[in-house]
């Protein structure tokens, strides 16, 4: 089993190197993944651990600062721009999208179903999108979702199972669906 996991990690590293600019001290696991329509749209800082999936479609940029961790089964999908600062902890099973993932127009959705999953209508650029910014020293709790157009301020915490639909002020704790400020953090 160790040999198989080692082979998977080597294969995944090659995929990351194909699509991303990676800083020193990079770590991944057998479940790590990286996909992009174009090379060079994903940038990963120094001493990062990426145990989830990064997905850039069209011209979607993903930038990750230094000493940031993205844990298992997390998915970051961009068609616009997602900026993640340094010293950020993204827990397990997190979803971060800078887009609606599917168009809201019923005619386009009907076309999607008629033409199958790999048709052009399934591309994220057909859905509404807006950049996501996660500032430095943020902790995102397990099973949370961050939606398009959101900025999470420096030093903030997103509680487990939260759905973040609006900006989070710096040094605050948010929780719930939709996420609301439940406490301020002294700093």
Language model region names:
Residues 139, 145-147, 165:
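Short Gly/Pro-enriched loop/turn and capping motifs at secondary-structure junctions
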Residues 156-157, 173:
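Alpha-helix N-cap/helix-start motif at helix boundaries, enriched for small hydrophobics
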Residues 149-151:
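Active-site/ligand-binding-proximal alpha/beta "capping" segment
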Residues 157-163:
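A generic "structured core" feature
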Residues 165-171:
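Gly/Pro- and small hydrophobic-enriched strand-loop and loop-to-helix capping segments
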Residues 1-115, 119, 124-137, 144, ...:
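Domain-scale signature associated with acetyltransferase and cell-envelope carbohydrate enzymes
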